[in-house]
Design a protein with these regions (language model features):
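C-terminal single-pass membrane-anchor helix
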Residues: 253-317
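Generic low-complexity, intrinsically disordered sequence content enriched
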Residues: 9-13, 87, 126, 153, ...
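Hydrophobic secretory-pathway targeting helix
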Residues: 1-16
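Acidic/His/Gly-enriched intrinsically disordered linker/tail segments
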Residues: 89-90, 94-103, 116-121, 133-266
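Compositionally biased, low-complexity repeat tracts
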Residues: 9-12, 90, 97, 302
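Juxtacatalytic substrate-recognition/specificity segment
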Residues: 16-138, 142
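Surface-exposed helix-capping loop/turn segments at secondary-structure junctions
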Residues: 55-62, 211-214, 266-269
C-alpha cells in the first residue's frame, strides 16, 4: 500500500491545473431565439465557472466545450432528436456528453432540486465532463460517485438535502450502491432521494480524506486500477464500508436524533401546557375565594349584628 501511495503522489504532478492554465474555451448557443439572452449571460460567466470546477477538482478542463441552452427537457422523440438526445427523464435539468464535451441545460429546471441556478447547474454538468475526460475510455465510474461529486462541486449540503434524506430513511432503506452503479431512478421522488444520498456519501468520503480525492482517484484509474481499489486509495475507505458507515451516521443524524429532540420538545410542550393549566386553575380558585370573601364583607356591612332571623312561613289561607 505504501508503494502504491508513493506512486500516486509521484503521478499527481503530471495531472492537475497549473496556475497559469489557459481559460477554457466555452461556446454557448441557444436552441431557440427566446433563449438567446440567457445564453449570452451564461456565455459571459461560463469560462469562470468551468475554471472554478477545474481548480476544485484539480483536473485539466477539455480544450473546448459546447453548452446548449433550452427551456424544458424533451417530451417527445422528435424533440429529443432535434437536440441530439435520447432517453432524457422528464425531471432532468441538464445533460453532459463526456465524449463530445457537449452540455445541454434545461433552463426552466435549473432551480429545481437538487440544483439552484444555471451557474450551479453548469458547474454540475462540467464536473461530469472533466471527470470523464480525465480517465481512460471505458473506465468504470459509478453513477453515485459521478452525481455526488458533481453536486459537491456545485454547492454544499443544505437543509433540503437533510429533509430529503430524513423522508427517505423514514419510509424506506436507502438505495444500495449496486442500484446506483450504472442507472438512476426513473421516478422524480426516488431520483431526488438518490441525489441527496449520493451527495451525502461523497461529502462523508471527502471529510475522511485529505483534499484532492478526485485527482487521486483519477490517477489510480489511469494506472489501471478498478474503481473500488482506486476509491479506497483515494479516500481511505472501501465503497461498501463507506456505504455502511454512511447509513449508520445518516440514520442517527437525519432520523433518530431529530426524532429524539422532537420527542423532548413534545414532552416539554406537554409539561408547559400542564403548568399553564395548574396556574390557571389556581388563579380561578383565588378569584372565587376573593369573591366569597367580598360577599361576606358586604353582608357584615349591611347587617352589623348579623343577618335578621328568617320569618316563619306564611300558611296559605
Amino acid at each position: 500500500m505504501t508503494a502504491v501511495l508513493l506512486a500516486t503522489l509521484a503521478a499527481l504532478g503530471a495531472l492537475g491545473v497549473p496556475e497559469d492554465h489557459p481559460v477554457p474555451a466555452v461556446r454557448v448557443v441557444a436552441a431557440a431565439p427566446m433563449w438567446e439572452p440567457l445564453a449570452k449571460q451564461i456565455a459571459r460567466e461560463a469560462p469562470g465557472v468551468v475554471t472554478r470546477v477545474a481548480v476544485r477538482l484539480d483536473l485539466p478542463p477539455p480544450p473546448e466545450m459546447l453548452v446548449v441552452v433550452t427551456g424544458d427537457p424533451p417530451r417527445t422523440a422528435a424533440e429529443e432528436q432535434r437536440l441530439g438526445l435520447d432517453g432524457v427523464p422528464p425531471w432532468a435539468a441538464g445533460i453532459a456528453e463526456a465524449s463530445t464535451g457537449r452540455i445541454v441545460l434545461f433552463a426552466r429546471e435549473a432551480a429545481s432540486y437538487p440544483h439552484r441556478d444555471t451557474n450551479g447547474l453548469l458547474a454540475h454538468e462540467a464536473t461530469h465532463v472533466l471527470l470523464e475526460a480525465s480517465v481512460p475510455r471505458g473506465a468504470r465510474i459509478p453513477r453515485w460517485y459521478h452525481e455526488g461529486l458533481a453536486l459537491s462541486v456545485e454547492r454544499s449540503t443544505s437543509l433540503e438535502d437533510a429533509l430529503e434524506l430524513a423522508w427517505s430513511l423514514a419510509w424506506s432503506r436507502p438505495l444500495p450502491l449496486l442500484a446506483l452503479e450504472e442507472g438512476w431512478p426513473a421516478g422524480e421522488v426516488d431520483a431526488r432521494a438518490a441525489y441527496a444520498q449520493a451527495l451525502s456519501m461523497v461529502a462523508m468520503a471527502e471529510r475522511h480524506a485529505p483534499p484532492g480525492g478526485a485527482r487521486r482517484l483519477v490517477v489510480r484509474l489511469r494506472a489501471g486500477d478498478p474503481f473500488d481499489r482506486a476509491f479506497t486509495i483515494a479516500y481511505g475507505l472501501d465503497p461498501e464500508i463507506l456505504a455502511s458507515l454512511w447509513y449508520r451516521e445518516a440514520r442517527w443524524r437525519y432520523l433518530i436524533r431529530p426524532a429524539f429532540w422532537a420527542a423532548l420538545s413534545f414532552n416539554g410542550l406537554l409539561g408547559t401546557l400542564a403548568l399553564v393549566a395548574v396556574l390557571v386553575g389556581r388563579e380561578r380558585r383565588r378569584r372565587r375565594m376573593a369573591e366569597w370573601a367580598e360577599r361576606e364583607r358586604l353582608e357584615t356591612v349591611d347587617y352589623p349584628d348579623g343577618p335578621p332571623p328568617l320569618s316563619p312561613p306564611v300558611n296559605p289561607a
